[in-house]
UniProtKB/Swiss-Prot annotation:
Name of this protein: Anhydro-N-acetylmuramic acid kinase
Keyword Cytoplasm annotated: no
EC number of the protein: 2.7.1.170
Residues binding ATP, per UniProt: 12-19
Record key words, sorted: ATP-binding, Carbohydrate metabolism, Kinase, Nucleotide-binding, Transferase
GO biological process terms, semicolon-separated: 1,6-anhydro-N-acetyl-beta-muramic acid catabolic process; amino sugar metabolic process; peptidoglycan turnover
Keyword check for ATP-binding: yes
Molecular function, one GO term: phosphotransferase activity, alcohol group as acceptor
SUPFAM superfamilies in UniProt: Actin-like ATPase domain
Length: 371
């Protein structure tokens, strides 16, 4: 059978770089042909994080970063195609999520909800010679939805089972769950912080980009008073559909919570407590929405041993596994999802799940940008 090749490009809330995946959709189960990760240059990451924080942000800075990210995404795609010896002419489309700078969905207090991703798809298409699908979230928002999470439709397509209840937990900067009951309807939402707070805290205190394996967290002790303050964030009490981002969970908020404790906490204790926050908020969502389901972890959090241990502790019903056990490496699930969403766009098939996002109907997502 002739390959059906698409490229997925993903930059998540962690704002640490680019995951790019070459996927063949010609068979019932998607095949990962090749994949690469490209770290953001330091100055690009600083610009992204700067524009993620509400301030007197310059339009000039936004416009330039939009194009610079487009160039980086194109470079990542071209590198992957070269290393897999795949001609650009064989690729049907690139699906590029872009870099989220602001996510203000329905319920966040804004009269006109919006979700903003940058990474110019015109630049990507021009520099790769490949049609590029981008701007996936705003149609769902226009239909009254959260615009997130968008991966549940892909999760259902590749991880759904007619015999086993599953819950797919994607732990990136933000954590989200997709409930896949056997022979029933999909549910899902963002549960709260994933890696974002843990990454920001270790970078501020240790100079590391992330807590490898959760090793630093394991040297600390859970601080119960701090955990209780963190869990008072109003997001956790909101009903689904709901989605969140850095706007809700960031270092400014964390510092305010630390100030409330009136305690001089060792930084490793804070890290251990942030790990617990992610584990509790995620497993609370699983227990509420899909109790007794098999819990499958993907995203960067799948490599945090300390976090997985705490998740298993709070959700002992079934062994916690990673998506590797279902045939897809945890690192590449999201990039593959946006390759799949690009395929859905070319086929004029819906990519959202209204039961998850709250949109008024299913919709074809994304715009097509030709070379």
């Amino acid at each position: 059978m002739k390959p059906s090749l698409f490229v997925g490009v993903m930059s998540g809330t962690s704002a640490d770089g680019i995951d790019v995946a070459l996927v063949d959709f010609s068979q019932a189960t998607p095949a990962l042909v090749g994949s690469e990760s490209h770290a953001y240059p330091n100055h690009i990451r600083e610009h992204v994080l700067g524009l993620c924080t509400p301030a007197n942000n310059e339009i000039d800075a936004l416009g330039q970063l939009d194009v610079e990210l487009g160039k980086l995404y194109a470079h990542a795609v071209n590198s992957l195609l070269a290393n897999t010896q795949t001609p650009a002419a064989q690729i049907q489309a690139i699906g590029c999520h872009g870099q989220t700078l602001r996510h203000r969905p329905l319920g966040s207090g804004y009269a006109s909800p919006f979700s903003l991703q940058i990474g110019d798809p015109n630049t990507i298409a021009a520099l790769t010679g490949i049609a590029t699908v981008a701007d996936f979230r705003r149609k769902d928002v226009a239909l009254g939805g959260q615009g997130a999470p968008l991966v549940p439709a892909f999760h259902a397509a590749v991880f759904g089972s007619t015999t086993t209840d599953r819950c797919i937990a994607n732990i990136g900067g933000i954590a989200n769950i997709t409930c896949l009951p056997a022979n029933s309807h999909i549910a899902g939402y963002d549960t709260g912080p994933g890696n974002a707070l843990m990454d920001a805290w270790i970078e501020a205190n240790q100079g590391a980009k992330y807590d490898a394996g959760g090793a630093w967290a394991q040297t600390g002790k859970l601080n119960q008073p701090l955990l209780e303050i963190l869990l008072q964030h109003p997001y956790f009490a909101l009903p689904a559909p709901k989605s969140t981002g850095r706007e809700d969970f960031n270092m400014t908020w964390l510092q305010a919570c630390l100030n409330q404790t009136n305690l001089p906490l060792p930084p490793e204790d804070v890290q251990a407590t942030l790990t617990e926050l992610t584990a509790i908020s995620l497993t609370d969502g699983v227990k509420r929405s899909c109790p007794n389901a098999e819990l499958v972890i993907c995203g960067g959090g799948a490599f945090n041993t300390a976090l997985l241990e705490r998740i298993q502790h709070h959700y002992p019903q079934k062994p916690t596994v990673t998506s590797q056990q279902l045939g897809i490496a945890p690192t590449w699930v999201e990039a593959m999802a946006f390759a799949w969403l690009a395929m859905r766009r070319l086929e004029n098939q819906p990519g959202n799940v209204p039961a998850v996002t709250g949109a008024s109907r299913e919709a074809v997502l994304g715009g097509i940008y030709t070379p």
